[in-house]
């Protein structure tokens, strides 16, 4: 008989479309850094394509806000119990990698701690924005933290957690693969006419509270720009036919696309976007935008008391100032949003000032190589515990 090492099994959990993409790049990088790693867990189409065994679709869990979470609680609770059982079972993973999705993932990290499974958190909770006191809770259940912003490590100084700044994952993923005019012609659109991007988000509750406002803003915008064309990319968490059905009643010339996101952004003269990771993607391309944020009134009232930063859009947070306008809750009206996009399209000096501010965001996001750094951290974390071996 001889000993044969089994592949290290890594559980990965994310509930966001952006996390699905980051997870996919991590898995691909891990294949080069340590081919002995295999991945399973919660994610989407991107992670599945990269070779991850998807036990629970991430889109089933992707909700934001207290009221919204309560509405999806049975589904979320079933998923949590399933993962908890695996962590405490005979086939428990060699490590747990958590990507964003803070509240769910911190509960899962606590279970991993009890089960003796080491935990790495990638795209960690935004403690710099709200509920900063969570750093102690995070340090108590997470072994290693891959920080994507340079100001994050200092938040954990003096705590028993290994924090490493790895850079932002979007820098690894950034690529424009098709020139603007060629891209638009391939979609049957006219490159000589203005193109507006409509980005209503990747979560179900974002569609519920924000999509209508964004589409109504597009209707309003056509009063001044009747020749405008609209692009709406489909997030990996949704089906194309569902988005097309959502758009149809508005009578807009919207082309719903399942194309590389940076090609879509590059084709746009302006973008109306939700407040999350996509604002950083738009910033990397340098396209001027307006940020829209709406949620259930009770969730917003609670969140407003907890948030510590003056801006809600990630692009503005990274810039440290209001580079692009934010339209939040009651201020998120079609009239105000369409007026901002009109200014972007017609005021050349204003347009240039926004692009200059977005260049600041690009500079502050650091350098590429994030996925490889995190893959190395995962491999190291696994080597810190005895390898599973079987006799044959």
Swiss-Prot record:
HAMAP family cross-referenced by the UniProt entry: LpxB (MF_00392)
Cited Gene3D superfamilies: Glycogen Phosphorylase B
Keyword Oxidoreductase: no
A GO cellular component entry from the record: membrane
Catalytic activity: a lipid X + a UDP-2-N,3-O-bis[(3R)-3-hydroxyacyl]-alpha-D-glucosamine = a lipid A disaccharide + UDP + H(+)
Pfam families in alphabetical order: LpxB (PF02684)
Domain of life: Bacteria
Example GO BP: lipid A biosynthetic process
Protein known as: Lipid-A-disaccharide synthase
Entry EC no(s): 2.4.1.182
The gene coding this protein: lpxB
Role, per record: Condensation of UDP-2,3-diacylglucosamine and 2,3-diacylglucosamine-1-phosphate to form lipid A disaccharide, a precursor of lipid A, a phosphorylated glycolipid that anchors the lipopolysaccharide to the outer membrane of the cell.
GO-annotated molecular function: lipid-A-disaccharide synthase activity; phospholipid binding
Family, similarity comment: Belongs to the LpxB family.
